A protein has these predicted regions:
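Membrane-embedded alpha-helical bundles of multi-pass transporters/translocases
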Residues: 1-287
């Protein structure tokens, strides 16, 4: 059971690896920018989404061992709301602030402004895909808790083929950005297929139950993104050099955007706000 479970959970890494191999047929810079963009996306995925999945997995398994479908559905939906509440603003942040983040982290030595501009579209694409990767990760844990190892593996196989086909096709038109887009479209297919399989197995899990939370998160995330874009535009007018300007933008927009987001979730009465806030505070308290 370990190897099938590993394959089902690791399809994201496999698809990104395939995209990197395909990128070698473009040019060396395509490999580099694809690697950097995917690593930026994997940071919030690994720090927050996988942490939520790890915490909720034993709760899901315990509920099923007690034959308590209601407890399973309740725990899964709570965890999924947390995953959405984390991944959506993180993805919007990458989409809006990709350029200053890349400049701050990587604009050193041989990595020049042209490389930054080549990486920005890929970071934006992966930012769009982050909620999909997160949804697929958590849905996989839900199926594993149900002792269903075959479905994630079967879905992973389908998505590997989707990613390969779309990668070969889209790279002809958009280069490295096409490879990133293929990853995201494969993640869309994976998250939809896994959710469909889990909801068929567990009737208590439905999209209808998540609509209120998803609407609140999308609204708060959109306003947060607008705040970040306006703040970046304002701070860019200070006339600082690229490095100082990007450091100022990131240091203001990231905590400022998070504050705006949490205030909006509070006003919208998002169900898991207290848990979400505790996760952020505990993570940054360790830093």
């Amino acid at each position: 059971l370990f190897l099938p479970g590993l394959m089902g959970a690791a399809i994201l890494q496999v698809n990104i690896l395939i995209s990197r191999l395909l990128a070698y047929s473009l040019d060396e810079s395509a490999v580099s920018v694809l690697y950097l963009a995917s690593r930026l996306m994997e940071l919030p995925l690994g720090v927050f989404t996988i942490a939520v999945a790890t915490v909720f997995f034993p709760l899901l398994a315990k509920a099923l061992s007690n034959h308590d479908e209601t407890a399973f559905s309740s725990a899964f939906l709570q965890g999924f709301r947390l995953v959405v509440g984390i991944s959506v603003p993180a993805g919007i942040g990458l989409f809006v602030l990709g350029e200053p983040i890349i400049e701050l982290l990587f604009l050193w030595g041989a990595f020049e402004k042209a490389d930054v501009l080549a990486t920005v579209p890929l970071v934006a694409i992966y930012g769009i895909g982050l909620p999909l990767y997160s949804a697929a990760t958590f849905a996989t844990r839900g199926l594993h808790a149900s002792k269903d190892m075959r479905t994630p593996v079967r879905v992973a196989g389908y998505c590997l083929l989707i990613n390969l086909f779309l990668g070969l096709l889209l790279m002809q038109f958009w280069g490295a950005a096409g490879l990133a887009a293929a990853n995201v479209l494969a993640a869309l297919a994976q998250s939809w297929l896994l959710w469909r399989a889990l909801s068929a197995r567990r009737p208590g899990i439905s999209c209808h139950a998540l609509r209120p939370a998803l609407s609140k998160v999308l609204l708060a995330g959109a306003i947060m993104g607008l705040f970040c874009a306006l703040a970046w535009s304002f701070l860019a007018g200070f006339g600082l050099n690229e490095k100082l300007s990007s450091a100022l933008v990131v240091s203001v927009c990231v905590p400022g955007g998070a504050t705006v987001y949490f205030i909006l979730l509070y006003l919208l009465r998002f169900e898991e706000l207290a848990t979400l806030k505790a996760m952020f505070l505990s993570h940054f308290a360790k830093r």
